[in-house]
Design a protein with these regions (language model features):
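Short tryptophan-centered beta-strand motifs in secreted/extracellular beta-sheet-rich domains
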Residues: 254, 410-414, 470, 474-491
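Short, aromatic/His-centered strand-loop micro-motif at the edge of beta-sheets
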Residues: 454-477
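Beta-rich carbohydrate-recognition and catalytic domains
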Residues: 22, 31-196, 201-249, 256-300, ...
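Extracellular beta-strand elements of beta-rich domains used
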Residues: 522-526
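Secretory/extracellular carbohydrate-interaction modules
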Residues: 389-452
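Short carbohydrate-recognition loop motifs
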Residues: 378-393
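Short, solvent-exposed beta-strand-to-loop segments that form ligand-recognition rims
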Residues: 493-509, 514
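C-terminal motif of bacterial Sec signal peptides marking the signal peptidase cleavage site
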Residues: 18-20
Length: 530
């Protein structure tokens, strides 16, 4: 009996002890879950950057005419330093006659005046029911000349579809066409592919040169040279450039920086260049001779096309156009003609060329905008104006910098792992939480944007890209210039990728990301117009 009572007492004591342990075990359990509880604030931190008001702006840096698009550009610098951009006016509803020549002008590459139509197309019975690219110059007597392409699909009675035509003006606003065709293509050259005359005075030879895109029967696309002393009678000289690479070398342009000569030309939906020691050549195309993007879908990849140069304030600018989107939304598919797009050329030590944003933009974007950043996905650390990202293969890290202003520049220094992919992300607003990404892709060796989300990058190939060698520098200086949907990415004053990114507008946020790699974005600064 006594043993039974003793045993019962022991059991009661043990029960009380276990009950006490159970009461104290609850807090221990909460601490074990503390990491999960601690993650809640991290989740909340991904939402701390609220949406800001967004209002689209009137295009200023990248204009287009109302109801139309900018086609091939013909730059001319006036005596007072104004840059005039004559261009082929295109629409979505061209008739039998099309591509009249219109004009913008600017003194700072930031704001443009629209002068409207300068030269209309002719009748179907004329050699020019469609106009093609040309050039403007001032002769030694002060008269202005516009040389341009006349195009008629009927073939002009067997003479050819394309010819060189001419107009004159005393004020560059009122142009008078010559009645007669200057000339058609010479013997052994295609009658239907003969266009884009570029005319200029050569002091050393005391004559005018005319360079034109032509197609020789055996050489293929060439830049053909003519000379004249009176701008009326022209003598064919022969090709100064025949790479035997492209079907045509459209919109040829010859210019000099220092003691080196350069020839730009366009085909394959992009602008190329070649280098020579003399204006007569020989010209050699560098292995990598595309400065802005190129589409990978034939006929629908006009990223930066038909660019010609203008010298302004001691700098040389490459003046062309960014094609209009070929489908709705972001795709990297761009059709012929769109918006004015100018890059400032940079001559490298090895005489190759690079591009950067026009220096005039510094006087346009004058207000510093404070950037507030926060981790959004994965391992992202923010310290002042520096962001570090780390992501294992198959995952990504993302930091959010808030609503993207309609017009802005953003500069920073970027490092990323060899073979990594990082860049800028757009989206993440209350209306659309998805992010699409503008990539610095060291794995593929290019810059690209197609409207892909981060998770889809590895499943698709780029449709609009600029080749880029990331091995040349450990740190890459990057600049974004944004105006509404137009987003231009410059890297190391070497290359650009121009895009339409609609997913970056209408209140979308801008951020930075790293996909399966480590990346850092340092010295981040954002500016908006004053």
């Amino acid at each position: 009996m006594r043993n039974w009572k003793y045993l019962l007492a022991v059991l009661l004591i043990m029960a009380l002890f276990l009950s006490a342990c159970g009461a104290s075990a609850a807090p221990a359990s909460n601490l074990a879950e503390a990491p999960e509880v601690a993650e809640e604030p991290a989740e909340s931190a991904r939402e701390v950057i609220p949406d800001e008001p967004y209002e689209a702006v009137e295009y200023s840096l990248y204009p287009a005419p109302e109801g139309g698009y900018v086609g091939d550009v013909m730059p001319f610098v006036t005596e007072d330093g104004t840059l005039e951009l004559y261009y082929l006016y295109d629409t979505d509803h061209n008739g039998q006659g099309y591509h009249p020549i219109y004009k913008f002008s600017t003194t700072d590459l930031c704001e443009y005046e629209d002068h409207g139509m300068m030269l209309n197309f002719g009748q179907m019975s004329d050699p020019d029911p469609a106009l093609g690219t040309g050039s403007v110059l001032r002769d030694q007597d002060g008269l202005y000349h516009l040389f341009y392409t006349g195009h008629n699909d009927t073939g002009n009675g067997g003479k050819g579809k394309e010819c060189v035509m001419h107009a004159t003006s005393t004020d560059r606003e009122n142009w008078v066409k010559d009645e007669d065709v200057l000339f058609f293509s010479p013997e052994n050259y295609s009658k239907d592919d003969f266009r884009d005359p570029e005319v200029f005075w050569v002091e050393e030879e005391q004559c005018y040169w005319l360079l034109i895109a032509a197609r020789e029967n055996t050489l293929g696309g060439v830049v053909l040279k003519y000379t004249s002393t009176d701008l009326k009678n022209w003598e064919v000289y022969g090709p100064i450039f025949a790479p035997m690479a492209q079907y045509m070398l459209e919109c040829p342009d010859l210019f000099r920086i220092g003691d080196t000569w350069y020839l730009t030309y366009s085909w394959d939906c992009c602008t190329y260049y070649a280098i020579g020691d003399s204006m007569n050549g020989p010209f050699i195309a560098p292995r990598d001779n595309i400065l802005d993007g190129q589409g990978t879908i034939s006929g629908n990849g006009f990223v930066f096309y038909a660019a010609k140069t203008a010298e302004l304030g001691g700098n040389t600018y490459l003046c062309g156009w960014l094609g209009r989107p070929g489908v709705s939304g972001d795709s990297g598919i761009y059709q012929w003609a769109g918006r004015v797009l100018n890059h400032q050329l940079v001559q490298n030590e090895d005489k190759t060329l690079g591009v950067k944003a026009p220096e005039q933009f510094a006087d346009y974007f004058t207000i510093d905008k404070l950037v507030h950043a926060a981790a959004r996905e994965g391992n992202a650390e923010v310290s002042g104006n520096n962001i570090s990202l780390s992501a294992e293969p198959g995952s990504y890290a993302l930091a959010d910098m808030g609503t993207r202003p309609a017009t802005m520049t953003l500069e920073c220094d970027v490092t990323l792992d060899e073979g990594g992919c990082a860049g800028f992300a757009f989206g993440g607003s209350a209306q659309d939480e998805t992010f699409t990404v503008l990539c610095l892709d060291a794995e593929r060796g290019c810059l690209h944007y197609e409207g892909y989300e981060i998770a889809d990058l590895e499943n698709f190939d780029p449709t609009a890209l600029t080749r880029f060698d990331f091995s040349k520098n450990d740190v890459h200086h990057v600049k974004l210039v944004c105006e509404n949907d137009v987003v231009v990415l410059y890297v190391d004053d070497l290359k650009a990728l121009s895009s339409h990114i609609f997913h970056s507008t209408d209140g979308a946020h801008i951020g930075v990301f790293a996909n399966g790699c480590n990346a850092s974005f340092s010295n981040i600064s954002m500016k908006i117009p004053g």
